[in-house]
């Protein structure tokens, strides 16, 4: 056994080094950056903190409690967990979180980054070893150039993507085997794993594979078509095998806001120089950007030289050079053409993470460069003279970049790139002068390449930054105690009044309303906006609640921290550690019967107070809940109003940004509970003062704000600072409203009388009873989803969407038992396809094995 291990280590030492060297490097970075357990920091930056970590917490709880994987009530009033799992969490490597406590989750995920990046280096090295035909140091260098390129470093926080990058080299080697040996098993399984782990990034891989196959050097037309059928067949088979994940994921993502087709109108983003400069040594990795033309392209200066060398040498056929070049040029154009980028991104906008498919270009460039390197090491010494063509080409490209770049080019990156080229050229010169033997020369340039890549990775992770877990998770223990005490079932909803992370309530697995994620339903986002909550493209937060919407959504508790200054209508319950619990003064329920008139509800008005008034009136037959309070025109500074509709909407132009560009003043003529709502996309910051004292500040637009119990004579001032950008104009719409407390009491009483009584809640199944006074609509504060099956007294009934967002059913007069069961749409069909796919691949493998045995017998 020992000898066998020694043989493996000897035969595969460089392949193993391609994994362990990045691990050592990245763990060294972790120690230097004080990543847990070496400190309190974490690699979980940007959305990894605000989205992915909370989703992992929900997943971990499900794994440990063996809860249903179909649905979760821990976000968004309830969401399709399987759809979200397929988008963010499906990698088998993520199952490691079931082995650790929640307190270790941030640490485990930080080091899972390390493992996944190292595996990307390993699979790339495996591919290059197969191309080279031997185990040598070059596979380590080029493998690390892939796994530690600026794309991987900058976007490493997208931990759910890494398996797709990891599988790409294996998929491409699988295509080689499929074409050359007519064996598609590796290709099929590698693509299956990629599709299973992240269907969205795998979609980009699939587009790339079509191009790769079309430009592959086929022997003849017949081979092109026969292998094409194999390629298509195994591709479809891998999709079928992953269908149990793909179908629910696809159907879920098609319900999001970003699912609407809207092709960009621009022709170009920028210039050649803007893009190519991102190849330069010393460029800072991009973690996120609003500008869709931004990109991560650095993958080594030796890569550029060897790619140029590939184009120059005579040992490679011209047609092969043209094929490789066409692929790279098309990908490069795709970076700069909005329409092509839109297609590459699955007909979706890029939303702050531009050019996500750049890893395909990087690997294609590295593959081309490695072919050039192989020619160099296999050829005679004089072949290396072609490197001067590569240097001249790089010089021309650098010159064009400096000439055409419209963004400020950091000259230090130009100097560093030129210096790196010079160092490599010295090595080539020493080799050409016969001072270095080939073995020493190739080892030296590969060593320098490793150093270059490692140095850029160290710099990149330092630039990325880290997050201090102590500051973000200091209240976890206290909130966990609150949850244990008060969150009795799914009907008990509670929320943080403000989160340190956008999805912090999900991190604590509270039955909450907040959801920030790519799988958020577009119709629900739109509805929450209409009701006065803060929303974004793929988010709706618990910011903007009123007593009515709190009751409607069954919000029973709010959690405050010392820094929270927002007013609340809830009553003080108790303090636990550093947090304070407030309780809704009204009884709430997960569902209510409503008058059939609710189907005429006008939910499309721009004023959320009107929307809530109409819902309360049509559903529960009460008078006007909110009375609009007239507000005076704002005072203006470095700003002018160009249009006024007389209803609180002002079109403006500003000449500068100052804290008091617009100042609205409300003087209360009586004691009342006052609310405001304003929309203003061009508002940079807002300060709200009450009698000269600041009570709220920050991003306060696009949500209802409760200003407390305002006394007669109180003065409210709303100061708005406008943005100083290219637009310098926009629209501000402000409305103030008074809550009618008598109507609210009557409304709460009627809602309690119409409440559905929950009797059982297990996983994806709910049941309860309702007593309808007449034929009515039963409204659930649960997002509408075709995956819900509702039965009344054991009989399945048709579900409908109120306002295109909420689950409702018609219920006849009398007392009834109502049960709900959720199964993700597409799961059953996907499971059937997956079983069929695995049966087919097993039959193919058995047939192949029998065929091999028959061939051996004939010999």
Feature annotation, model-predicted:
Residues 3, 8-9, 633-859:
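Active-site-proximal, structured, solvent-exposed surfaces of multi-pass membrane proteins
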Residues 448-468, 483-552, 586-588, 593-619, ...:
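Extracytoplasmic/lumenal acceptor-recognition loop(s) of multi-pass membrane glycoenzymes
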Residues 23-121, 144-165, 253-258, 265-291, ...:
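Membrane-interface coil-to-helix junctions
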Residues 46, 50-51, 57-59, 92, ...:
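Periplasmic/ER-lumenal interhelical loops and adjacent helix-loop junctions
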């Amino acid at each position: 056994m020992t000898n066998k291990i020694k043989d493996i280590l000897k035969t595969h030492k460089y392949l193993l080094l391609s994994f362990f060297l990045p691990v050592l490097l990245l763990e060294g970075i972790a120690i230097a950056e004080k990543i847990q357990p070496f400190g309190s920091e974490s690699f979980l930056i940007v959305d990894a903190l605000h989205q992915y970590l909370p989703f992992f917490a929900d997943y971990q709880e499900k794994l440990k409690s063996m809860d249903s994987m179909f649905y979760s009530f821990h976000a968004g009033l309830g969401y399709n967990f399987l759809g979200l799992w397929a988008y963010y969490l499906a990698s088998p490597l993520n199952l490691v979180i079931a082995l650790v406590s929640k307190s270790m989750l941030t640490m485990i995920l930080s080091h899972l980054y390390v493992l996944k990046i190292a595996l990307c280096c390993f699979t790339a090295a495996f591919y290059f070893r197969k191309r080279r035909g031997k185990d040598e140091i070059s596979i380590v260098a080029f493998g690390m150039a892939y796994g530690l390129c600026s794309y991987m470093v900058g976007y490493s926080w997208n931990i759910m993507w890494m398996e797709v990058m990891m599988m790409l080299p294996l998929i491409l080697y699988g295509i080689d085997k499929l074409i050359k040996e007519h064996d598609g098993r590796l290709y099929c399984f590698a693509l299956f794993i990629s599709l299973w782990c992240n269907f969205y990034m795998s979609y980009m891989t699939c587009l790339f594979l079509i191009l790769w196959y079309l430009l592959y050097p086929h022997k003849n037309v017949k081979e092109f078509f026969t292998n094409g059928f194999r390629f298509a067949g195994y591709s479809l088979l891998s999709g079928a095998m992953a269908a149990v994940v793909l179908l629910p994921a696809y159907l879920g993502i098609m319900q999001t806001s970003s699912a609407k087709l809207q092709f960009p109108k621009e022709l170009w983003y920028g210039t050649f120089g803007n893009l190519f400069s991102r190849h330069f040594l010393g460029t800072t990795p991009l973690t996120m950007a609003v500008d869709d033309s931004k990109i991560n392209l650095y993958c080594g200066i030796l890569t550029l030289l060897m790619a140029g060398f590939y184009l120059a040498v005579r040992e490679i056929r011209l047609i092969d050079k043209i094929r490789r070049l066409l692929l790279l040029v098309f990908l490069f154009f795709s970076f700069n053409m909005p329409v092509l980028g839109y297609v590459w991104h699955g007909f979706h906008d890029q939303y702050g993470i531009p050019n996500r498919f750049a890893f395909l270009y990087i690997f294609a460039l590295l593959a081309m460069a490695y072919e050039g390197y192989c020619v160099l090491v296999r050829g005679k010494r004089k072949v290396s003279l072609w490197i001067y063509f590569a240097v001249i080409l790089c010089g021309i490209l650098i010159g064009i970049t400096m000439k055409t770049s419209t963004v400020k080019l950091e000259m230090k990156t130009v100097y560093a790139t030129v210096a790196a080229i010079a160092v490599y050229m010295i090595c080539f010169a020493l080799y050409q002068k016969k001072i270095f033997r080939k073995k020493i020369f190739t080892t030296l340039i590969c060593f320098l390449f490793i150093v270059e890549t490692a140095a850029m990775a160290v710099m990149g992770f330092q630039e990325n930054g880290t997050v201090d877990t102590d500051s973000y998770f200091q209240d976890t223990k206290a909130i966990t105690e609150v949850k244990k005490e008060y969150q009795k079932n799914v009907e008990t909803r509670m929320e943080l009044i403000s989160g340190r992370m956008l999805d912090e309530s999900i991190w604590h697995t509270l039955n909450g309303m907040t959801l920030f994620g790519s799988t958020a339903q577009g119709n629900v986002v739109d509805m929450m906006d209409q009701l006065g909550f803060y929303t974004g493209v793929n988010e709706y937060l618990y910011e903007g609640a009123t007593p009515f919407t709190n009751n409607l959504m069954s919000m029973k508790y709010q959690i405050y921290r010392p820094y929270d200054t927002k007013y609340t209508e809830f009553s003080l319950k108790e303090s636990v550690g550093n947090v304070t619990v407030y309780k809704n003064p009204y009884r709430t329920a997960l569902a209510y019967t409503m008058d059939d008139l609710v189907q005429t509800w006008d939910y499309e008005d721009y004023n959320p107070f009107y929307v809530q008034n109409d819902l309360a009136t049509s559903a529960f037959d009460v008078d006007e809940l909110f009375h609009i309070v007239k507000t005076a025109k704002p005072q203006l500074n470095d700003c002018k109003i160009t249009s006024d509709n007389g209803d609180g909407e002002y079109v403006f132009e500003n000449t500068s940004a100052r804290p008091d560009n617009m100042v609205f003043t409300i003087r209360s003529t009586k004691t009342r509970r006052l609310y405001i709502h304003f929309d203003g996309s061009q508002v940079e910051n807002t300060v709200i003062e009450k009698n000269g004292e600041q009570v709220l500040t920050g991003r306060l637009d696009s949500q209802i704000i409760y200003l407390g119990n305002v006394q007669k004579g109180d003065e409210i001032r709303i100061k708005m600072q406008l943005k100083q950008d290219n637009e310098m104009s926009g629209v501000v719409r402000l409305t103030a409203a008074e809550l009618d407390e008598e109507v609210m009491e009557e409304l709460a009483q009627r809602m309690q009388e119409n409440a559905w009584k929950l009797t059982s809640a297990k996983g994806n199944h709910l049941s309860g009873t309702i007593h309808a006074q007449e034929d009515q609509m039963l409204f659930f504060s649960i997002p509408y989803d075709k995956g819900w099956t509702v039965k009344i007294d054991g009989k399945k009934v048709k579900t409908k969407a109120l306002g295109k967002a909420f689950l409702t059913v018609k219920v006849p007069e009398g007392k009834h038992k109502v049960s709900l069961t959720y199964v993700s749409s597409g799961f059953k069909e996907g499971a059937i396809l997956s079983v069929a796919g695995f049966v087919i691949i097993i039959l193919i493998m058995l047939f192949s094995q029998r065929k091999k045995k028959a061939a051996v017998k004939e010999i």
